[in-house]
UniProtKB/Swiss-Prot annotation:
Homodimer. Interacts with FtsZ. Pfam families: SepF. GO terms for cellular component: cytoplasm. This is Cell division protein SepF. It comes from Bifidobacterium animalis subsp. lactis (strain AD011). Cell division protein that is part of the divisome complex and is recruited early to the Z-ring. Probably stimulates Z-ring formation, perhaps through the cross-linking of FtsZ protofilaments. Its function overlaps with FtsA.
Length: 156
């Protein structure tokens, strides 16, 4: 019955063609070593899930001491990397986009917004084309959210 299925599958193109003389031939191969019988590998004892008392260390809460804020005046989109590097290092950035065209400013804000999102930080608009970007560990307290600025980044 198995020979019939092999020939049918071969005829339909669903398997390799098997010559008739090789169909019933038994091939003697060396028995493969079983994984269970292979003793070349020695088991490693499982690590304890509970740390020993000597391994425990006290963890103090991290309180950021902000001693620097970077101001960046990009001249082109390539300068946006400076924003990413500063934020990655935990330094708040004041981003002044007054020296670039509006299309370049949109691209820089788009890149900077992605970086801020990636580090779980925040972005606040200070004026029409000046923004404060801060890492996650820096809290920004806005004085007046009803200052008359629209939700659009570049319009009043």
């Amino acid at each position: 019955m198995a020979g019939f299925m092999k020939r049918t599958m071969s005829y339909l193109g669903m398997s390799d063609v098997v010559p008739e003389d090789e169909d019933d031939e038994v091939i003697d191969e060396e028995p493969e070593s079983s994984f269970d019988t292979d003793r070349s590998v020695t088991p490693i004892p499982a690590a304890s899930t509970q740390p020993s008392t000597s391994q425990r260390k006290s963890v103090a809460p991290f309180h950021a001491n902000i001693n620097r804020i970077t101001t960046i005046h990009p001249q082109s989109y390539e300068d946006a990397q400076l924003v990413g590097r500063a934020l990655r290092d935990g330094i708040p950035v004041v981003l002044n986009l007054t020296d670039v065209s509006q299309s370049q400013a949109y691209r820089i804000i788009d890149f900077s917004s992605g970086v801020v999102f990636g580090i779980s930080g925040s972005i606040e608009r200070v004026t029409e084309r000046v923004f404060l970007l801060s890492p996650a560990r820096v809290d920004i307290v806005a004085e007046d959210t009803e200052s008359g600025m629209s939700d659009n980044l570049f319009e009043n």
